[in-house]
Regions:
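Short glycine-centered segments of the SAM/dcSAM-binding site in methyltransferase folds
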Residues: 39, 130-131
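Conserved class I S-adenosyl-L-methionine
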Residues: 1-35, 49-53, 133-159
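Short catalytic micro-motifs in class I SAM-dependent methyltransferases
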Residues: 107-108
Length: 169
């Protein structure tokens, strides 16, 4: 099974139980230091879990990408008519022209199998002085526990922050 199919099959129920982490998402947006007028890229946005928290930070524009058509369909319904958001069903690695002040991956980093390529692409897409944020709504052990039955071609799990950060040196 490929990653697009995996997430398309789960899109309809992806948000079940997600309201309990709203405060966590707000804290992530705050700690990301998103300032009014900045441009933000929400990578692997899924059904738009971070949208409200990002909107509250008052950026000038939010581009949200995901390669699952069904995830993007659900996300689009959440921001229908809101010109702040531009949603695209595409792969991060297809992006070439745009640049951003903040790039965030929320609850999706384990699904990027080639982390070294993520490092390269983020470096291309970040404006000077920009920030890249990888965040999750749960601890590493819980996330890895949730992924024990996920096919290995869909997730790599999370290493410790120290181990993951070696790619970014």
């Amino acid at each position: 099974m490929d990653i697009r199919t995996y997430f398309n099959q789960r899109a309809a129920h992806w948000d079940d139980g997600e309201q309990s982490v709203d405060q966590i998402r707000r804290m992530i947006a705050f700690l990301s230091d998103i300032q009014e007028g900045m441009s933000v890229l929400d990578v692997a946005c899924g059904t738009g879990a971070m949208f409200e928290a990002l909107r509250e930070r008052k950026p000038s524009h939010i581009t949200a990408v995901d390669l699952s058509e069904k995830m993007i369909e659900i996300a689009a319904r959440k921001v229908e008519g809101d010109s702040l958001f531009e949603l695209q069903c595409r792969d991060l690695f297809e992006m070439t022209q745009e640049t951003f002040d903040r790039i965030i991956i929320y609850n999706a980093y384990p699904h990027f199998m080639e982390k070294d390529k993520v490092v390269q692409k983020v470096a291309e897409l970040l404006n000077p002085g920009g920030r890249f944020i990888v965040a999750h709504g749960a601890c590493r052990e819980k996330i890895n526990g949730c992924h024990t039955n996920v096919p290995k071609e869909i997730t790599s799990g999370l290493l410790s922050a120290k181990e993951e950060s070696r790619l970014w040196e």
